[in-house]
Amino acid sequence: GAINTDTPAVPFTITTNGGANFSTGTSPVTLAGQGWVNIREIRLAGSTVPLASTWTSVNTWQVAVPLTFGPNVITLEAVDFTGAVVGTDSITVTNTGGIEPPQPSTLVVSEIYYNPPGNLETTEYVELMNTSAATLDLSNVNFTAGVTFAFPGGTLLGPGSRLLVVKDSAAFTAAFGSGLPVAGVFPNSLSNSGERLELRRADGAILHSFVFSDLPPWPVEADGDGYSLVLANPYSNPDHANPLSWRASLVAGGGSPGASDSQSYAAWKAANGNHADDEDVDGDGFTTREEYFLGGNPLVAEQTLKPTFQIEPGGTFLISVTRRVTAENATVLPEISTGLINWANDPTAIFLSNIRQPGSPAVDRLTFRLTPPPGAPRFFARFAFGP
């Protein structure tokens, strides 16, 4: 509907603590503010995902923002109904939270290099990542299957930080350089065909226990071609046992131990013309945001970005879509509808493959098998992208 221009304009501002910087011991932090009726959504600067917001009155709002440990410079953007940014405000919130034991949702297995090519077998490694806002105490956290290793007492892992356990420290340093966060060495080797990897807390509680594989739909490029397995969306509390949670690393040569190989939407957008999120500059039917996820160029019309489908003899459908390898925290799920109004994840969808495509930028093609709902006269499918 039209905006009521009789309503006096209200500048977009953060009002918590009078807009002044402050400290807190909890995360997420709730920020309050004010804004005008033309605001459709509020998000963190550089993000494409709206924050969950509550409008407490016609022109006042609240949002919850997760914090990392220490100072957090938070810049919020107000986005109107055309997708334009109509206001920004910033505040620094310092998280004074303490040290916590790891949980399955806060300590993830973020990268696995299980089958290096040729004579590089001794460069194997496993990477852990802290996805929380607190420092994690990894004292006596231990791998009990796949590899054998216990973290020494006093091992701490800061928010967003990564830690590596490696097969051979000398071989690892020769391959990847010095200065990486190596916690220690495991005496055995990872299976080249995949196996169970199990990580337990000091009290014996299982943090993660899952089987990875070298067979589809697991990324086959990690099986001897020099790529690692990378957890695609580590901040989403992903199911490590689900092959859809993983992708092959951006490059061969062992992946990116100790670091991310993703590119944020904000950085990609700035490097590609900084067009509005919902703008289709090249007229190929895909917005700037969709070009990022699909692996396109917002200035080059590319019909190859369109999802494909094929009807199988038994009445099932094969549908596939491309995904930019470096899309940060990108998940993709098929959704179905019988009337184009209500959409839902398809519980019967079978994930079949995740194959790296030739060319640049690096793009994977994900393929699923869908079964039409029984008795449905019509059946529609689409893909949902997002963190």
Where are these predicted regions, by residue range?
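Short, composition-biased motifs enriched in small/polar/acidic residues
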Residues: 255-387
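Activation on beta-sandwich/Ig-like modules and their edge loops
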Residues: 92-244, 249-255, 259-261, 300
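Structural beta-strand segments of beta-rich domains
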Residues: 27-31, 122-124, 315-319, 330
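Short, solvent-exposed loop/linker segments at the N-terminal edge
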Residues: 20-27, 115-120
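Exposed beta-strand face motif in extracellular beta-rich ectodomains
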Residues: 70-74, 193-195, 377-381
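Short strand-edge motifs at loop-to-beta-strand transitions and within beta-strands
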Residues: 59-63, 163, 364-368
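Middle-to-C-terminal accessory/interaction subdomains
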Residues: 1-19, 26-27, 34, 208-210
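Long, low-complexity serine/threonine/glycine- and acidic-rich segments characteristic of extracellular
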Residues: 28, 32-96
